[in-house]
């Protein structure tokens, strides 16, 4: 079983699974079907061969966290193969109930494969977001990826840390280049979303956002202005902060009200402000296009 060369040219996410249960194979085949994913199911006999041959094309691994995992991971470490990974928690044990999923896990807590892995219950329905999270965390790794604590000393003499760092950097760049604009979506950090900020941080953020929007309004109809770049920067900013369109509309209306009051005091007609609806439409169109081109298709 190998990865198709013709499929590589399509903007798909390549998934390689290592599952011992046929029911899990059938389940993930059904979930991951469609034009977004290209899927290959490996066995314990051919997994290492498939990964070694396809390490430049595979975007994410999905394997079970079971008794065979240490041997598999050990081989990947020796070969300096580092890929985004989702680990399925399938063992019915005290360990399962005592260990949180990676979304709630302390970043300093020891890992199995690498510190960007995502651990989920095997029956978790939202495997798609787990894959997205695994890729996102992998892309945000520093150049030096830390091995699990229990393995650092074992592989220190083999300079495996440097090899893994090189592999991570190369694979990260490959993902960004091959996924193109789609890669922008994966660089979003949910912890930096507006609704995750403290009240004080939100206040400061809105002050900056309103100032930037005011500059765009003032420059929008000026000749030889840098307003196009300002709009691009503004849209990128609200995209990565996950700011809602309603919030942008609110900022626009507040600014228009302020301008209207000023014009009224000056005895001038405020109808001119209607032209600035084009500014709002322009920004919303830019933002919608960015989401359209960047959000992965589920099917």
Curated annotation (Swiss-Prot):
PROSITE patterns on file: KAIA_C, KAIA_N
InterPro entries with a match to the protein in the record: CheY-like_superfamily, Circadian_clock_KaiA, Circadian_clock_KaiA_N, Circadian_clock_protein_KaiA_C, KaiA/RbsU_helical_domain_sf
Pfam families tied to this protein: KaiA, KaiA_N
Nucleotide-binding listed as a keyword: no
KaiA N-terminal domain boundaries: 9-179
A biological-process GO annotation: circadian rhythm
Residue intervals of the KaiA C-terminal domain: 189-297
Function comment: Key component of the KaiABC oscillator complex, which constitutes the main circadian regulator in cyanobacteria. Complex composition changes during the circadian cycle to control KaiC phosphorylation. KaiA stimulates KaiC autophosphorylation, while KaiB sequesters KaiA, leading to KaiC autodephosphorylation. KaiA binding to the KaiC CII domain during the subjective day yields KaiA(2-4):KaiC(6) complexes which stimulate KaiC autophosphorylation. Binds oxidized quinones via the N-terminal PsR domain, allowing it to sense redox changes and possibly mediate clock input.
Name of the featured protein: Circadian clock oscillator protein KaiA
Organism: Acaryochloris marina (strain MBIC 11017)
């Amino acid at each position: 079983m190998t990865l198709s060369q013709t499929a590589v040219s399509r903007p798909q996410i390549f998934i390689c699974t290592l599952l011992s249960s046929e029911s899990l194979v059938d389940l993930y085949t059904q979930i991951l079907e469609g034009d977004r994913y290209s899927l290959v199911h490996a066995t314990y006999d051919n997994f290492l061969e498939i990964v070694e041959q396809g390490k430049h094309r595979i975007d994410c691994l999905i394997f079970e966290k079971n008794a065979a995992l240490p041997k598999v991971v050990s081989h990947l470490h020796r070969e300096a193969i580092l890929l985004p990974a989702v680990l399925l928690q399938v063992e019915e044990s005290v360990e399962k109930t005592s260990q949180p999923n990676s979304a709630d896990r302390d970043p300093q807590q020891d890992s199995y494969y690498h510190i960007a892995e995502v651990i989920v219950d095997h029956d978790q329905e939202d495997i798609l977001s787990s894959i997205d999270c695994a890729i996102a965390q992998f892309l945000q790794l520093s150049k030096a990826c830390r091995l699990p604590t229990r393995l650092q000393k074992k592989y220190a003499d083999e300079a495996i840390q440097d090899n893994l760092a090189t592999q991570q950097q190369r694979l990260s760049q490959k993902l960004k280049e091959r996924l193109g604009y789609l890669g922008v979506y994966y660089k979003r950090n949910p912890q930096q979303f507006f609704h995750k900020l403290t009240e004080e941080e939100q206040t400061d953020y809105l002050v900056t956002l309103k100032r930037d929007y005011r500059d765009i309004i003032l420059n929008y109809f000026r000749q030889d202005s840098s307003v196009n770049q300002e709009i691009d920067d503004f849209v990128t900013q609200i995209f990565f902060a996950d700011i809602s369109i309603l919030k942008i509309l609110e900022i626009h209306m507040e600014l228009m009200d302020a301008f209207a009051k000023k014009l009224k005091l000056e005895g001038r007609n405020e109808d001119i402000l209607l032209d600035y609806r084009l500014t709002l439409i322009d920004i919303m169109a830019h933002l919608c296009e960015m989401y359209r081109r960047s959000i992965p298709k589920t099917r």
